[in-house]
Amino acid sequence: MEAGKLDYNEHFHWGRFEWMHAHSFLDEDKLTRIVLFKDENGAIVGLITYDTSYDDRGYLIHTSSEKSLLERMIETVLESEGLGAVMKVNAKDAVLCRMLREKGFEKKHKCGSVLSLDLSNSLEYDMPDAYTMSPRGFAADPWQYQLAIHKGFDNDGIPEKWEDAFLKRIPHGNEDLKTFAIAHNEYCAHCGLWYTTGDTAYVEPVATVPEHRKRGLAKAAVYEACTRAKALGAKRAIVLSDQEFYFRIGFALSSEAYAWGKEDSADFD
């Protein structure tokens, strides 16, 4: 979590790491490819990881920009991936970007945008008459929660139910920071948010069930979640997205992550 306080790590918030370990799509057979780096005192100072699918790999997260540490991290990826290695790095990570360039890597393409919302701004919202916002202390129904996410991200059919232990595997999840717009006992929109301490809260991409869109529910769900994080000490909220919706409700570009590789490297996103 200390890594999350550094702006060059904001494209891979700790919430992504916790969520992937609970996700049913996690490539569990690749978990041994995750590498931790420790300093002489045993503190974790570096992480090489992927996000849920091993195809989305090459994230280098670090709390120290010492050359020796970054050298070890780069060499570890090269030993695993060979010359086809791709590393996903925030443009704010000036030291790591410079070292990659010196080693013959090139910036390939953008692989993520981080948007930021200043929580000192107004977070007021309106709810249509037919809808209510889930209160603090709300015990979400797991099936309704799953349906809201499934439909809200435009998936067809009926999903296979999550295992009972699914959400229990997330150690720092805060149920009060999950918000739902509800009508007639149906969860119509949902925003999940991750926060423990520090300045930054992490917003999951908001989901609205198609037949309930264009009613301000997504904005309401995001603003309510951010209001609750602000009350706990957060000063800003970030989301990994470049959708116009977030700009319309006050988010602004904070940083971008790029894939770095050599001429013969793979071109995975």
Task: Outline where the language-model segments fall.
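Conserved active-site tyrosine of GNAT-family acetyltransferases
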Residues: R98-R101, Y246-F247, F251-A252
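A mid-sequence, solvent-exposed acidic-amphipathic segment
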Residues: I149-G192
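Acyl-donor-binding surface of acyltransferase catalytic domains
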Residues: D51-D129, A257-E263
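Conserved donor-binding loop and adjoining core beta-sheet/short helix segment
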Residues: G4-E81, A183-H184, C188-E204, V209
